[in-house]
């Protein structure tokens, strides 16, 4: 069983570790310069972004980083999903879908106009996941 919740300060080490895993997967491991202090300030002091985590057996197995955006065409705010990552051993169990449902509910509850993200064009597993859940390519 797993649960998704808003991240807290004590989650930062685990999230940073997962960010590094994602960066390695995307062949960008050398580009992660974020430290725990920078991350803490950005998330909890300046509130540039928000983080969600997924826990299973009291261990963080995935995370999502998002921030609020704005569409001039819609005249409404939205959510931009910066990162969505689930540890390899926990994939294909519905966790990614639950992260997106959590964010979609935030959009609905706050009358936001969209939930959007980008995916690398070579990331076939992620592209297949997004297609399976009915996401539209813009």
Protein language model annotation of sequence segments:
Residues 90, 94-102:
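Conserved acetyl-CoA pyrophosphate-binding loop and the N-cap/start of the following alpha-helix
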Residues 53, 59-67:
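Conserved beta-strand in the GNAT
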Residues 41-53:
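A short helix-loop-beta-strand connector motif used in the catalytic cores of GNAT acetyltransferases and
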Residues 77-88:
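Conserved acetyl-CoA binding element of GNAT-fold acetyltransferases
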Residues 97, 121-138:
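Conserved active-site alpha-helix within GNAT-family acetyltransferase domains
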Residues 16-42:
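Conserved GNAT-fold acetyl-CoA-binding loop/helix
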Residues 3-15:
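A short beta-loop-alpha structural element at the N-terminal edge
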Residues 108-118:
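Conserved GNAT acetyl-CoA-binding A-motif
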């Amino acid at each position: 069983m797993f649960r998704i919740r808003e991240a807290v300060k004590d989650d930062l080490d685990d999230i940073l570790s997962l960010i590094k895993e994602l960066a390695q997967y995307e062949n960008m491991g050398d580009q992660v310069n974020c430290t725990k202090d920078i991350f803490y300030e950005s998330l909890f002091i300046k509130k540039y972004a928000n983080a969600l985590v997924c826990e299973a057996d009291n261990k963080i197995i995935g995370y999502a980083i998002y921030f609020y955006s704005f569409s001039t065409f819609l005249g409404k705010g939205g959510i931009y999903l910066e990162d969505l990552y689930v540890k390899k051993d926990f994939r294909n169990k519905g966790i990614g879908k639950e992260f997106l449902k959590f964010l979609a509910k935030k959009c609905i509850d706050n009358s936001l106009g969209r939930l959007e993200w980008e995916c690398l064009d070579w990331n076939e597993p992620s592209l297949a996941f997004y297609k399976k859940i009915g996401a539209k390519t813009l």
